[in-house]
Amino acid sequence: MISRITLGASVATPGSVIHRDGRAARWAASNGIAAIFSGAEAAAERLRGLPEWRNARTLKANPDSAQLPVRQRALEDGKTVYMAVPRLAGPEPFFALDPDHLSESPRKAASISGAARSARKVALAELAPVDLVVVGCVAVGEDGARLGKGGGFADLEFALAGAAGLIGPGTVAVTTVHELQLQPAGGIPLAEHDVPVDLVITPDRIIDCRDRRAPRPVAGIRWPELTPEKIAAIPLLAAEWAGRPDR
């Protein structure tokens, strides 16, 4: 994943804060969580109107605040939401939010603190197949190429879920962003492990990238690209690594 991309007169880097005249896109990778952007509610509503949304019963979503409105609407619409525990910490690195068994409102339950109260923590093996993947980003190209916060967790989650058979070639990946986070096609280079998105949703429009996005990486974990420190920091990875016969 690249580490920086120019956005107009500003430069977005993982860990940066961007604020355009106090009126539009703003986000911060503070403690690994991207802050909500102006128009996030409208973007979530636009996503809600798509057939890909209506047909989905199970979502896998990132835990960032920018996509909280998406997670909220999923619960309101009766969808099961699997939300990654930040940094995939612990042996059960996903929250399983069941819309029929929430201890508080969908809005509160969709937050990280609310999920800790309303959801069960589950292992990867306990997840059901995923119908729609929701990811966050700092910037995204009109060709679906995305710039994350630099930790590589979204790509890693996708690889793990793909290897487990929870995500297939036809599973749609979507992000919600502000218009100022958009880059022209070709503006964000992709590494071999980077997962492009199929749909980009802004408060004002829908960009379908499926006919022009790069191919997705082959399902599975790219072990040579992971450092021993990264593997040791994520219990799920450490367990997978320990079970490899060729390690």
Language-model features: locations:
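Surface-exposed, charge/polar-rich loops and edge strands
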Residues: 3-35, 43, 49-56, 77-80, ...
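Extended, H/D-rich, highly charged conserved domains that either
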Residues: 61-75, 79-81, 87
